[in-house]
Amino acid sequence: MIPYNHKNNLAGFMEKRDLYNENSEVTSKTYFKGDPIPAGYYPMVVMICIQNSNGEFLMQKRVLSKGGDWGVTGGHPKSGETPYEGMVTEVHEELGIDISNKQLEIFSQGCDGVDCYKMYYLKADYDISDFKIQEEELTEVKWFSIETLNHMIETGELNPNQVACIMKCYNYLNKKSK
């Protein structure tokens, strides 16, 4: 198998993305997935915490080739997409649902020296059967209580890069309810 890069994009998986500055502002610079990022520029990462009316959070389990761990839905906006549009695209690609008419709340955003990021929150009720998962990326989706998520954090069952997202969302919701 030939490793993917934009120069040998035989399968049509070329993914061009915009680069951002340290203030999370889009620049005129772009890069292709897998290419090195020039100094002083950052890719945008978007993530979403979806919570149902029972207080449970939707988690997705990645295929083994992508770590095989649980995490929230997320990814990188394609070139020309805003972070919001990228989040809508990622949710549609990975979960098979359209959230373009839903009210998303940003609960955290910034740049951490590696990535720029926007973290979104959505309160919505979906039945697991509503999801049409992207089988190349996911094996299952499931609703989890905050207690179960805390246990999964302690046992390392969650994607370590996304524990911060879950904790920030939980803190956001606690502040919002007061």
Residue ranges and their predicted role:
Residues 6-11, 65-70, 79, 112-178:
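Nudix hydrolase/Nudix homology domain
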Residues 45-70, 74:
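A glycine-rich, hydrophobic loop/mini-helix early in the fold
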Residues 59, 71-106:
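The catalytic Nudix box helix
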Residues 3, 8-47:
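Acidic, metal-coordinating catalytic segment for phosphate/diphosphate chemistry
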Residues 36-41, 108-119:
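Acidic pyrophosphate-coordinating catalytic loop
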